[in-house]
Amino acid sequence: MTFTAVLENIARSTIATKIGEKLKTAKSIYLSGLSRLGKGLISTHLCQQQTKPLLIVTVEEATRWALQLQSMSWRVYLYQPLDTFPYESAQIDLETAWTRIEILAELLAKPQPNLAIATTIKALQPHLPSTQAFQKHSLYLNIGDSQSVKLLASALARLGYVEV
C-alpha cells in the first residue's frame, strides 16, 4: 500500500476529522501516543487538507522526521542545531548557515503548501550558558546593602564592564 492510499484512508477516518476540527479552534495540536510514522501520516493529512506548511519540533529525532517526510512527498528542510557548548565560540559552518538562511528566506517568501521543516528544540533555543556558569558570572545586589565603590568597580570589571 502506498502512502497516498494510506493518506486517503486516514482522510476518511473519524479521528482525522476530530483532529482537524480541533486544529481549527486550537491553532496547534500535540499528538501523543502514536508512533513517529502515525504522527507523520496524521500531520501530513491535516497540512495537505489545509494547504499549509508543516513544522515538526522534536527533542532529538529531526533527521529521522526529515527522511520520513521526504518519503511522503514533502519538500523538507532540516533546521540543524549548532553543536557547541556554552562560552565556546559559535563558529557555524557555511553549509549549516546557508541551510538556515535558505529556510528563513523561503518562509519569508510565499510558503509552499508542501514545505516541511524538521528541527529540534535545541536548534530553536539561543546559545545560553548553564545555570552554574551564569551564576558564577553574575553580581547580585540587594536593596539596603552597602559596598565600597572600589569593590563594586572591581566586581563590575571582572564581569566585563568598562569604566567610561
Task: List each language-model region with its residue ranges.
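ASCE RecA-like P-loop NTPase motor cores
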Residues: 1-164
